[in-house]
Amino acid sequence: MTIVNLAAYHFVSLDANEQWRPLVTARCNELGLRGTILLAPEGINLFIAGTREATDAFIAYIRHDPLFEGKFATLQFKESLSDSQPFRRMLVRLKREIITMKKPAIKPELGRAPFVDARTLKSWLDRGHDDTGRPVVMLDTRNAFEVDVGTFDNALDYRIDKFSEFPEVIDANRADLEGKTVVSFCTGGIRCEKAAIHMKEIGIDNVYQLEGGILKYFEEVGGAHYHGDCFVFDYRTALNPQLQPTENVTCFACRAVVTPEAQRSPSYVAGKSCPACAQAASAA
């Protein structure tokens, strides 16, 4: 059976999440969906999967049901297919933020950060500058272990372990961004959107977010100016620029990404350990 995987997020002020939670949970269970939906005062973030019929019904529900007062009428979904269900259960959770930065929740009504679409970004990278002649710098907002799987050529990577470290590293490295057009990017768009909004709020000029993140870029223009694969937070571990699962796996013990090369190491035992485990053990 073909399973449809949906991912979506939207920054919008919400104040009825406690009332919505049981109703959304019940509807998802009726449709046989699995995955996670996060609701927070700043918006919604979701990863769900099910049959085509079920996911189509969910999209219609979340966009058009009067319960939501049109808050999600423009919610855009990213879709991929798999041969099996990647999630074990259905959860609807209430959170302080839909992506944790440990900063006061943003106010979506004040306006999102400017975005650049995949084709425009590719043309900038082809030329080495934006349409005004300003040099372009790519800023990776993901965690270090994700970056190691793949990233844009010459991207800035501050080796953060969690997204809440982003404001601090930006404050410490503002000089890297001055006089340039900064394009923040992440897997699907949510972190780079919040990162771009934060940079805009602290006075960094000429900041854009990559619309739809790396996965949308792959969908639109392939792997141009990108090396490696894109880590994803499900059983597939990583997708290549053709949006196909790769041979990368996640270590059962330490959750590190294990490349095909690392899987040939004597330290790799499927379901038990990997070279990263061995290195950590030897350093202890």
Curated annotation (Swiss-Prot):
Keywords: Oxidoreductase, tRNA processing
GO BP annotations listed: tRNA modification
Domain Rhodanese: 132-226
CDD domains hit by this protein: RHOD_YceA
Pfam family, one: UPF0176_N
Disulfide bonds: none
Catalyzed reactions: uridine(34) in tRNA + AH2 + O2 = 5-hydroxyuridine(34) in tRNA + A + H2O
Record-stated family: Belongs to the TrhO family.
Protein name: tRNA uridine(34) hydroxylase
Protein encoded by which gene: trhO
